[in-house]
């Protein structure tokens, strides 16, 4: 344990789907749990059962049958502050078991996070949790640090939102950031829909979690979608079976790659957007012509929705088709990319040069929440 060191910084990456939290300097987060707050659907009937009025994270997940589940972070942006406070409280006191007033805390935010949101995060940290110091960093920038680079373009795709963020010498270029409201949760919903067409019914929030598991275990990205569809139609080589919690076994075939294909063809779910290969290209084209070469050669994948087998090869193929023919294109898919935002935060918060970057409680008291715009960019 490193918390005997009084001042170890905490790193908390709040995603739409999962909270990743732990101590700076560690190589992986200590706590990873769903960003969910659940409230009982019915009045408790058992006397003395000690019914709580709300449950957070894994406990909410395990009692999902009797709860209504809410996600306080939608599309990467915090929308429900009361529930978010519950999640932070749970993170500090139940998961990490630390007193937040003793540790500087690094939080992450979505690219293009509204200014009012950064201020609100800052305010809650200092006023509710009394942290001695805090900092807010952009998720994609941290992922790039984790890959050992300061220049590149990050495709960060999690549960609620996908971003393309070009970064030059450590600074995100806001004018070229592309946001796509299509990510893991939408792919899970789409898989629920196409499994229903196969005759398997998944409807409740509890059943959605089962489908998410099917997606994580069996889905992959096809290098050539049409070819793969033809193969799936003529042979059973692509079929896999999955055992449901009640013991029933279901078989899935072309759904395995039709589900993540949505990332490249959002029209599958009725979205009029460009696919992730095109948004990457568009983002690069919005950057200065002199840095494009560096971006093409440093395409870093980050987040859980980039974990599909085959996604890097497919990106390589698609971007090569869009880019100038002589351009060197490299897709970097680090094996730990599911947690690379957190890892980047852990690296950043433990750098000696970073120590003067923290916003201290004193600075906050003097300047108020708007200090965050001056210190964190």
Swiss-Prot record:
GO terms for cellular component: cytoplasm; cytoskeleton. CDD domains: ASKHA_NBD_actin. The modification N-acetylaspartate is found at residue 3. Pfam families: Actin. Residues 1-2 form a propeptide. It is found in: Cytoplasm, Cytoskeleton. InterPro entries: Actin (IPR004000), Actin/actin-like_CS (IPR020902), Actin_CS (IPR004001), ATPase_NBD (IPR043129). Belongs to the actin family. It comes from Xenopus tropicalis. The modification Tele-methylhistidine is found at residue 75. The lineage of its organism: Eukaryota, Metazoa, Chordata, Craniata, Vertebrata. Keywords: Acetylation, ATP-binding, Cytoplasm, Cytoskeleton, Hydrolase, Methylation, Muscle protein, Nucleotide-binding, Oxidation. Xenopus contains at least three different sarcomeric alpha actin genes that are preferentially expressed in either heart or skeletal muscle. This is Actin, alpha sarcomeric/skeletal. GO terms for molecular function: ATP binding; hydrolase activity. In tailbud embryos, expressed in embryonic muscle (myotomes). Actins are highly conserved proteins that are involved in various types of cell motility. The modification Methionine (R)-sulfoxide is found at residues 46, 49. It catalyses: ATP + H2O = ADP + phosphate + H(+). It comes from the Eukaryota. Oxidation of Met-46 and Met-49 by MICALs (mical1, mical2 or mical3) to form methionine sulfoxide promotes actin filament depolymerization. Mical1 and mical2 produce the (R)-S-oxide form. The (R)-S-oxide form is reverted by msrb1 and msrb2, which promote actin repolymerization. Polymerization of globular actin (G-actin) leads to a structural filament (F-actin) in the form of a two-stranded helix. Each actin can bind to 4 others.
């Amino acid at each position: 344990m490193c918390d005997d060191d009084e001042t170890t910084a905490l790193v908390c990456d709040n995603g739409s789907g999962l909270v990743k939290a732990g101590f700076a300097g560690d190589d992986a987060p200590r706590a990873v749990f769903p960003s969910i707050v659940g409230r009982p659907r019915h009045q408790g009937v058992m006397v003395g059962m000690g019914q709580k009025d709300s449950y957070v994270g894994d406990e909410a997940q395990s009692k999902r049958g009797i709860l209504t589940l809410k996600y306080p972070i939608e599309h990467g942006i915090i929308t429900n502050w009361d529930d978010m406070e519950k999640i932070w409280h749970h993170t500090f006191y139940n998961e990490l078991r630390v007193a937040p007033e003793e540790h500087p805390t690094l939080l992450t935010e979505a690219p293009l996070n509204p200014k009012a949101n950064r201020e609100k995060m800052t305010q809650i940290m200092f006023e509710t949790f009394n942290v001695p110091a805090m900092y807010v960093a952009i998720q994609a920038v941290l992922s790039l640090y984790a890959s050992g680079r300061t220049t590149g373009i990050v495709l960060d795709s999690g549960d609620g939102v996908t971003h393309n963020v070009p970064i030059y010498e450590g600074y995100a270029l806001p004018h070229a950031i592309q946001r796509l409201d299509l990510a893991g949760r939408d792919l899970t919903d789409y898989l629920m829909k196409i499994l229903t067409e196969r005759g398997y019914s998944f409807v409740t929030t509890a059943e959605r979690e089962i489908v998410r598991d099917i997606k994580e275990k069996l889905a992959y990205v096809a290098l050539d979608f049409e070819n793969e569809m033809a193969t799936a139609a003529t042979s059973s080589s692509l079929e896999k079976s999955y055992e449901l919690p009640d013991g029933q076994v279901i078989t899935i075939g072309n759904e395995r790659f039709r589900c993540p294909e949505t990332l490249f063809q959002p029209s599958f779910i009725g979205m009029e957007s460009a696919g992730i290969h095109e948004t990457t290209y568009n983002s690069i084209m919005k950057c200065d012509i002199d840095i494009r070469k560096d971006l093409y050669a440093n395409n870093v994948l980050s987040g859980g929705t980039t974990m599909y087998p085959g996604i890097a090869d497919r990106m390589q193929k698609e971007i090569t088709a869009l880019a100038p023919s002589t351009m060197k294109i490299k897709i970097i898919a680090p094996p730990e990319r599911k947690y690379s935002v957190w890892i980047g935060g852990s690296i950043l918060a433990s750098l000696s040069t970073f120590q003067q970057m923290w916003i201290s409680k004193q600075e906050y008291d003097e300047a108020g929440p708007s200090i965050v715009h001056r210190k964190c960019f």
